[in-house]
């Protein structure tokens, strides 16, 4: 550590600081928040944008088409099999996304942080939309259920960041959610043009 600190044992004069500021001013900032680099192109990794190395990015969840024309997406949680439902269903131009919690497989994600749980649930919703050929921009309605009403603002802020420019119809209510570890559950509806 001390060797690394010695590398920075120097002073910059005013001209050097100004030169650095001028270079930085020419940079294009990456918009968004931590984690956004994995949600929208360009997909930034430690190696840079790798999207040009693949012909197509695979969908997050497998889909199946029913005989009635419905397309179903399954995220693989234990709840889908147990209760007999799909993460999302597309019929015609309408997509309905089931109540979505911060669950990955059989594991709850986000601990006791309602904002982290809301972020993960919205990531799953976005994955379901992508699997059915849609985007978050096509969401027209969301419903948010919180276990503790005191968490409403933290959850609403997460929703606001993700839907800032989309502004779907929304309802947020307190509910006694299934599973003590879950603080947030979110439903969504989309219309694909």
Where are these regions (language model features)?
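N-terminal presequence-like segments and the immediate start of the first folded domain
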Residues: 45-123, 127-140, 146-193
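Terminal-tail/helix-coil boundary detector
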Residues: 2-71
């Amino acid at each position: 550590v001390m060797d690394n600190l010695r590398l920075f044992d120097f002073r910059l004069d005013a001209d050097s600081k100004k030169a650095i500021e001028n270079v930085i001013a020419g940079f294009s900032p990456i918009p968004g928040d931590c984690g956004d680099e994995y949600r929208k192109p360009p997909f930034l990794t430690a190696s840079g944008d790798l999207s040009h190395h693949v012909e197509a990015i695979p969908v997050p969840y497998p889909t199946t088409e029913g005989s009635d024309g419905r397309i179903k997406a399954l995220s693989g949680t234990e709840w889908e099999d147990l209760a007999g439902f799909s993460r999302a269903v597309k019929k015609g131009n309408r997509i309905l996304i089931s109540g979505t919690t911060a669950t990955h497989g059989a594991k709850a994600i986000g601990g006791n942080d309602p904002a982290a749980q809301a972020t993960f649930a919205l990531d799953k919703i976005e994955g379901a939309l992508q699997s059915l050929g849609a985007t978050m921009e096509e969401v027209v309605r969301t419903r948010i259920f919180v276990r503790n009403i005191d968490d409403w603002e933290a959850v609403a802020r997460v929703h606001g960041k993700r839907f800032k420019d989309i502004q779907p119809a929304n309802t947020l209510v307190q509910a006694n959610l299934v599973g003590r570890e879950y603080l947030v559950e979110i439903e969504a509806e989309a219309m694909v043009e």
